[in-house]
Amino acid sequence: KEGYLVNSYTGCKFECFKLGDNDYCKRECKQQYGKGSGGYCYAFGCWCTHLYEQAVVWPLPNKTCN
């Protein structure tokens, strides 16, 4: 599974500005989803890879980013 890293309180994606390989996204994805995951910056949001099937990613139901 893959998807955008999301803040569970706000419903917002984690923003990033250095597209492609991005240490911030890699670190945040690993912290949120575990060591096996990876991440990079895609369309100014952290995109996480190698997630477990039940991982919660953006968009969250009934939560809009404010």
Curated annotation (Swiss-Prot):
Similarity section: Belongs to the long (4 C-C) scorpion toxin superfamily. Sodium channel inhibitor family. Beta subfamily.
Residue ranges annotated for the LCN-type CS-alpha/beta domain, each copy included: 1-66
Classification via CDD domains: neurotoxins_LC_scorpion
One GO molecular-function entry: toxin activity
Cellular compartment(s): Secreted
UniProt xrefs under InterPro entries: LCN-type_CS_alpha_beta_dom (IPR044062), Scorpion_toxin-like (IPR003614), Scorpion_toxin-like_sf (IPR036574), Scorpion_toxinL (IPR018218), Scorpion_toxinL/defensin (IPR002061)
One Gene Ontology biological process: defense response
GO cellular component, one term: extracellular region
Chief location: secreted
Organism: Centruroides suffusus
Protein name: Toxin Css8
Asparagine amide sites (modified residues): N66
Keywords for this protein: Amidation, Disulfide bond, Neurotoxin, Secreted, Toxin
Task of the protein: Beta toxins bind voltage-independently at site-4 of sodium channels (Nav) and shift the voltage of activation toward more negative potentials thereby affecting sodium channel activation and promoting spontaneous and repetitive firing. This toxin compete with high affinity with 125I-Css4 bound on rat brain synaptosome and may bind with high affinity to Nav1.1/SCN1A, Nav1.2/SCN2A and Nav1.6/SCN8A.
Domain of life: Eukaryota
Record-annotated disulphide pairs: C12-C65, C16-C41, C25-C46, C29-C48
Tissue expression per record: Expressed by the venom gland.
Domain comment as written in the entry: Has the structural arrangement of an alpha-helix connected to antiparallel beta-sheets by disulfide bonds (CS-alpha/beta).
